[in-house]
Curated annotation (Swiss-Prot):
It comes from the Eukaryota. GO terms for biological process: positive regulation of hippo signaling. It comes from Homo sapiens (Human). CDD domains: FERM_B-lobe, FERM_F1_FRMD1. Residues 54-369 form the FERM domain. This is FERM domain-containing protein 1. PROSITE patterns: FERM_3. Residues 430-443 have a biased composition (Low complexity).
Length: 549
């Protein structure tokens, strides 16, 4: 719970400036260059008390002090405008002025007079006698509305103050189940505060652990552990600009449950002496109150079932309602900007991760050879190389051959046998002696083929018989599996587990024809599926040449 620092005296509105903030804080006194801090001349008709001014000490999230002078009848809006002018804050919609009441921060309604938030000494006249000078009235500039994306804050100065506020909240955080998040936040904070890690400058104890870690982590891990491991995490943020590191810190800090939230203590019953319930106003949510009661109706429950808590006084309920209403209205205004930023970030992520589909030149050439006049597309071509059909149109085999340097991928060959050629093969078994059904030697060769990454291609022509062995690298198979799609993985599984009927493929073709252009004659040939072999007979004058794989 957000608790103000100690050492402010009994009355938090009247505080000795020498005791707070901690040492090292910078005090910004009014000067002629800052006209917002200059005293205004009284106008005609104003009484003596209206012409007097009060000293107000405003503490910023960066531990800076602003010493301002405002009129007795000034409103919170006037003081807030002076703070923004002196601190050079242009985008101040996420900040607000608050005072401490009962050890809680109460945000001011800027339309109300300051006399309602300070003690009764505010209206007392000054005596020019020997009376000691008064201590200034203390106010705080704090983050009133949280936002998880720091890019919504357009002003650099306002973003830095927002970062300083979250950094102070992280030091008071108690999320023990997110210990690793605090080390990530510390690394981002070091990158934002100190820049790139340099071995010469950032050696030894170049940062104070108490300024970047909660006390419970320092007690649990120790200072030596933090100083030993944090330089490595700091070096990992190399290349991250201070602005990007600050935005990363804001985003990660808002993911902690007890950082972007305002806590208020409530009573569950009127008779309770001390508050027993803590209400947290987080990034989203709307609450309703009635008089001294704060009434919360949960979404999805009947109207009769309500959670009722008591604030103790009407003044607290009124200001709590004002804070809830203002937070809700602000998030409604910021929602379109957040959506645009989210879409832009998603578009940037898509540019970093793209999917590439690579196809072979042979496949593109075969796909472009479809007959426009015959009405047959390349999808129905039964004997062309295909990578996209998963069922192969009833074909029984898948052959993968690496024969040329330009053909580097295994492909599915779907070839349907013409009806007349199938009859010729049944009548003439001698023309293809290696296409016998379930031959023992064929099974032995198939097992050897599975073990050895070698393919034998036997070519028999008119005069000579040549045997070629083509070595297939297993690395090519793994590259295919990573580069192909789902269809190729199914075809690869079919190639690993072929049907046991036959492993020999016979192609009867004319000598003057080429295998690269079978689609030109396919439309005129009748086809029939064959379960034993894949045969293609292109009639010609020369005797056929047989390829056995």
């Amino acid at each position: 719970m957000a608790v103000p620092p100690r050492g402010r005296g009994i009355d938090p509105a009247r505080t000795n400036p020498d005791t707070f903030p901690p040492s090292g804080a910078r005090c910004m006194e009014p000067s002629p260059e800052r006209p917002a801090c200059s005293q205004q001349e009284p106008t005609l008709g104003m009484d003596a008390m209206a012409s007097e001014h009060r000293d107000v000490l405003v503490l910023l999230p960066s531990r800076e002090q602003l010493r301002l002078a405002v009129g007795v009848k000034a409103t919170g809006r006037e003081l807030f405008q002076q703070v923004c002018n002196v601190a050079s804050i242009r985008d101040a919609q996420f900040f607000g002025l608050c005072v401490v009441r009962n050890n809680e921060y109460i945000f001011m309604d800027l339309e109300q007079k300051l006399s309602k938030y300070f003690s009764k000494d505010w209206k007392k006249e000054r005596n020019e006698g020997n009376e000691k000078p008064r201590a200034p009235f203390v106010a705080f500039l704090r983050v009133q509305h949280y936002v998880e994306n720091g890019r919504v804050i357009s002003d650099h100065r306002a973003r830095h103050l927002y970062y300083c506020h979250l950094k102070e909240r992280v030091l008071r955080s108690q999320c023990a189940h997110r210990e690793e998040a605090y080390f990530l936040l510390a690394a981002c904070a070091l990158q934002a505060d100190l820049g790139e890690h340099r071995e010469s400058a950032h050696a030894g104890r170049y940062f104070e652990p108490h300024s970047y870690f909660p006390q419970w982590i320092i007690t649990k891990r120790g200072i030596d552990y933090i100083l030993r491991h944090m330089p490595t995490l700091h070096r990992e943020r190399q290349g991250l600009s201070p602005k990007e590191a600050m935005l990363c810190f804001i985003q990660e800090a808002c993911r902690l449950e007890d950082v972007p939230v305002h806590f208020f203590r409530l009573h569950k019953d009127k008779k309770e002496g001390r508050p027993t319930v803590i209400l947290g106003l987080a990034l989203r949510g709307v609450h309703i109150y009635q008089g001294k009661k704060l009434e919360i109706q949960l979404d999805g429950l009947p109207a009769a079932q309500k959670l009722v808590y008591y604030t103790g006084c009407t003044w607290r309920s009124r200001h709590l309602l004002h804070l809830l209403r203002a937070s809700h209205q602000l998030h409604l205004r910021v929602r379109p900007t957040l959506q645009q930023l989210r879409q832009r970030e998603e578009a940037e992520e898509k540019q970093h991760y793209r999917e590439s589909y690579i196809s072979d030149e042979l496949e593109l050439d075969l796909a472009s050879r479809s007959f426009p006049g015959s009405g047959v597309s390349s999808q129905h071509c039964p004997h062309c190389l295909s990578r996209h059909s998963a069922d192969s149109h009833g074909s029984s085999y898948t052959s993968g051959i690496k024969a040329n340097s330009w053909l580097r991928e295994s492909r599915e060959m779907s070839v349907d046998v013409p009806l007349e050629v199938h009859g010729l093969h049944e009548k003439e078994p001698s023309s293809s002696p290696r296409t016998s059904r379930s031959h023992p030697s064929t099974r032995g060769d198939s097992q050897a083929t599975r073990q050895e990454p070698c393919t034998q291609v036997r070519t028999r022509g008119q005069s000579a018989e040549a045997v070629h062995q083509i070595q297939e690298m297993t690395a090519g198979v793994s590259e295919e599996q990573h580069s192909h799609g789902l269809d190729d993985m199914q075809l690869h599984q079919l190639a690993l587990h072929p049907a046991p009927t036959s492993l020999s493929h016979t192609f009867h073709r004319a000598l003057d024809c080429r295998l690269a252009g079978p689609c030109e004659t396919r439309a005129t040939l009748p086809s029939k599926r064959s379960s034993n072999c894949l045969a293609l007979d292109l009639f010609g004058e020369a005797p056929p040449q047989e390829f056995v794989v």
